Amino acid sequence: MHILMIGLNYKTAPVEIREKFSFQDSELPQALHQLRQMKSILECTIVSTCNRTELYVVADQLHTGRHFTKTFLADWFKLPKDEFTPFLTIRENDHAIEHLFRVVTGLDSMILGETQILGQVRNSFFIAQEEQVTGSIFNHLFKQAITLAKRAHSETDIGQNAVSVSYAAVELGKKIFDDFKGKQVLILGAGKMGELTAKHLHSNGAEQVTVINRTREKAAELAKRFLGVDRPYNELTEAIVEADILISSTGATGYVVTSDMVSHALKKRKGRPLFMVDIAVPRDLDPALASHDDVYLYDIDDLQNIVQTNLEERRTEAEKIELLIEEELVEFKQWLNTLGVVPIITALRTKALTVQGETMESIERKLPNLTEREKKVLRKHTKSIVNQLLRDPITRIKELANAPEREEALDLFTKIFALEEELAEQEKQEKVKQAEQEWLAKKRPITCMEKQSHVMVKS
């Protein structure tokens, strides 16, 4: 058994490539079953976000697993392999497991340590589970990965410091105001950065939002998102009088808010502090504003400096998570190795119980006058002898599962107990079971998610 990750992300592929390889949640059931039906694929999960599309599979062979996973991508997206192969990242076994752990903890994200990816991976896994395309390996692996991510964010401070310009403005504001509740936010311009900053302020308690923009319709549209109000551009000075926080991100080429304008407003504010954030380039707010008492002015460079400092702090926290990942990787490998000896343990039990059964049949033939109670007692005690004899070998083989000489030791164990025939029969039954599952997958009923998707397409 081998674990593979094949995919592309923001590091390896530009957005014009990534957008061609994106799965909608409604497409995942069909995609998962199509991938699972590919030769060599035993289990699978697909993680698809705006920054990555990654296919995780359990394959019986590495080379066929790689080949048929790429074939699935080519078939699904109807693109030749040579068009996307240069952008692919491939991770195998330990490296695939470690990669998943880094992804789910946010260490591989564009914004280091972000938590949104945890929900996205969890959702992808739940869909795969619901579609019954995961098995014992991925059920264990993804549950462990999700638990690791929760542990990483509870045991470290990686998510505590702002690493976006918009959220850095909120951090600065908290140094001036103990609480944003009841504070008036004035957004000057309807730009994306201003909107993001307002969103963070609003989620931190700033409920009263006013938007001013040269195009009134855009101002009204943005104000509506925050249950705020829009005002005409010629009321800017009056709006500054009422504001506690001003966020400016217009596309103007000169200063939109001048020192003289604020001087008039300050006379009516009676010493209330005014927090001003200039996200625009070129700047909207006259740098001379910083000379006024009760005015706290910050521009894009100030915010970038905060972001850079916080990034360094996050990198320090990320090192702690790397240690957690190492621990979890060792733990999963030990579990996986133990899982690998299950067929040998099963074969040993099968052989021992077969001998016990044959012995009981021989006893019953030679002692035909045994009562049912006597037979029951004999079965119980002979089975007890078998279990006692097997206890030490089974304990030892579980220990050998994680020993350096694992392969040689397991091979010797198999030969000593002559388990080749039992293992061959297990393998045969497993192939029959796999063939039945593949046949059932092709005959499977349409899922609720697919029905909803079909209805949406028709409508």
Curated annotation (Swiss-Prot):
One GO-annotated biological process of the protein: protoporphyrinogen IX biosynthetic process from glutamate
Domain notes: Possesses an unusual extended V-shaped dimeric structure with each monomer consisting of three distinct domains arranged along a curved 'spinal' alpha-helix. The N-terminal catalytic domain specifically recognizes the glutamate moiety of the substrate. The second domain is the NADPH-binding domain, and the third C-terminal domain is responsible for dimerization.
Other notes: During catalysis, the active site Cys acts as a nucleophile attacking the alpha-carbonyl group of tRNA-bound glutamate with the formation of a thioester intermediate between enzyme and glutamate, and the concomitant release of tRNA(Glu). The thioester intermediate is finally reduced by direct hydride transfer from NADPH, to form the product GSA.
Known catalytic reactions: (S)-4-amino-5-oxopentanoate + tRNA(Glu) + NADP(+) = L-glutamyl-tRNA(Glu) + NADPH + H(+)
Subunit and interaction comment: Homodimer.
Coiled coil, from the record: none
Residues where NADP(+) binds: 189-194
Gene3D superfamilies, per the entry: Glutamyl-tRNA reductase, N-terminal domain, NAD(P)-binding Rossmann-like Domain
Family of the protein in this entry: Belongs to the glutamyl-tRNA reductase family.
CDD domains to which the protein is assigned, alphabetical: NAD_bind_Glutamyl_tRNA_reduct (cd05213)
Site location (Important for activity): 99
InterPro entries linked: 4pyrrol_synth_GluRdtase (IPR000343), 4pyrrol_synth_GluRdtase_dimer (IPR015896), 4pyrrol_synth_GluRdtase_N (IPR015895), GluRdtase_CS (IPR018214), GluRdtase_dimer_dom_sf (IPR036453), GluRdtase_N_sf (IPR036343), NAD(P)-bd_dom_sf (IPR036291), Shikm_DH/Glu-tRNA_Rdtase (IPR006151)
SUPFAM superfamilies: Glutamyl tRNA-reductase catalytic, N-terminal domain, Glutamyl tRNA-reductase dimerization domain, NAD(P)-binding Rossmann-fold domains
Name recorded for this polypeptide: Glutamyl-tRNA reductase
Biochemical pathway: Porphyrin-containing compound metabolism; protoporphyrin-IX biosynthesis; 5-aminolevulinate from L-glutamyl-tRNA(Glu): step 1/2
Active-site residues, record numbering mapped to chain: 50 (nucleophile)
GO molecular function ontology, one term from the record: NADP binding
Role summary: Catalyzes the NADPH-dependent reduction of glutamyl-tRNA(Glu) to glutamate 1-semialdehyde (GSA).
Enzyme's top EC category: oxidoreductase
E.C. number(s) listed in UniProt: 1.2.1.70
Chain residues that bind substrate: 49-52, 109, 114-116, 120
Keywords of the record: NADP, Oxidoreductase, Porphyrin biosynthesis
